[in-house]
Design a protein with these regions (language model features):
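N-terminal "arm"/small-domain region of PLP-dependent enzymes with the aminotransferase-like
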Residues: 6-59, 157, 188
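Short beta-strand-to-turn element immediately C-terminal to the catalytic PLP-Schiff-base lysine
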Residues: 42-43, 200-203, 224-230
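Conserved N-terminal alpha-helix of the aminotransferase class I/II PLP-enzyme fold
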Residues: 50-98
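Substrate-binding/gating loop at the entrance of the active-site cleft, primarily
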Residues: 97, 117-133
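Conserved PLP-anchoring active-site segment centered on the Schiff-base-forming lysine
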Residues: 105-124, 145
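Active-site phosphate-binding strand-loop segment of PLP-dependent enzymes
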Residues: 138, 142-192
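Conserved core segment of the aminotransferase class I/II
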Residues: 212, 219-246
Length: 246
């Protein structure tokens, strides 16, 4: 801990006393909040809060079991169907967080992949997921299609190309169409993490790709989801341990 402090790497939590729109109260002082992911200010919206109250009164505050036992309610089912329609995909699977969703996707595909290529600035959850399944972490230069092409040329077998869509630190966007074209021509699947784009920009989801987004940013709530082909989502239900055992 002392080393972390000396190297200015020690993490701490600030206690938020009250949040009023784009202002927060810390230690009795009102501050403008520039660090929130609540992009559309829905987390504190009156209609959203009213909907939560209705949901609590109807379904309670917990599911009481995992999805594959007795915890998958009609509310979960309706949300999955609505998200599938919004994203234009065949089926959706809900997860508790984006971190869990990314680990769940990688863990399900573990035995089907020979290589993975990731953008240099991908989110930590994607990097951790890569490490957890035991495949080498290979990263191409950020948003550089030529670098990705060079990396792909050295691979063999079935691959996965992974990118954030909107990158959280700078707000730049991946070239989804070019990445998908490379994936199709090189025995690979493309996966995008759209945590920071969902609800802000129109989803761009190529056929046969994997799409993950969160509900805790622009949507102002919590959770995450994966959308794609029905067979792939069914495969996640069977093989994604973070989903099965949560």
């Amino acid at each position: 801990l002392n080393n972390l402090k000396q190297n200015h790497l020690y993490r701490s939590r600030k206690v938020i006393e009250t949040r009023l729109g784009n202002h927060i109260i810390i230690n009795g002082k009102s501050l403008i909040n520039f660090c929130s992911n609540d992009y559309l200010s829905l987390a504190d919206h009156k209609l959203v809060k009213e909907a939560y109250k209705i949901g609590v009164n109807k379904y309670g505050v917990g599911s009481g079991a995992s999805h594959l036992v007795s915890g998958h309610s009609v509310a979960h089912n309706e949300l999955e169907n609505s998200l599938a329609e919004y994203t234009g995909q065949e089926k959706v699977l809900l997860f508790s967080t984006g971190y869990t969703a990314n680990i769940g996707i990688f863990s399900a595909l573990r035995d089907d992949l020979d290589w993975i290529l990731q953008d240099k600035l991908n989110h930590a959850s994607l990097i951790d997921a890569n490490h957890l399944i035991g495949l080498p972490l290979q990263r191409y230069i950020h948003n550089n299609i030529e670098s990705l092409e060079r990396k792909i040329s050295k691979q063999s077998g079935q691959g996965l190309i992974v990118t954030d869509n909107i990158f959280s630190m700078d707000g730049d966007q991946a070239d989804i169409s070019s990445i998908e074209k490379l994936a199709q021509g090189n025995n690979a699947i493309m996966m995008q993490d759209d945590a920071h784009g969902f609800g802000i920009i129109e989803p761009n989801i190529p056929v046969n790709s994997i799409y993950m987004a969160t509900l805790g940013k622009a949507a102002g709530a919590m959770g995450a989801f994966v959308s794609g082909k029905e067979d792939f989502i069914e495969y996640l239900i069977q093989k994604s341990r973070p989903y099965v055992y949560t």
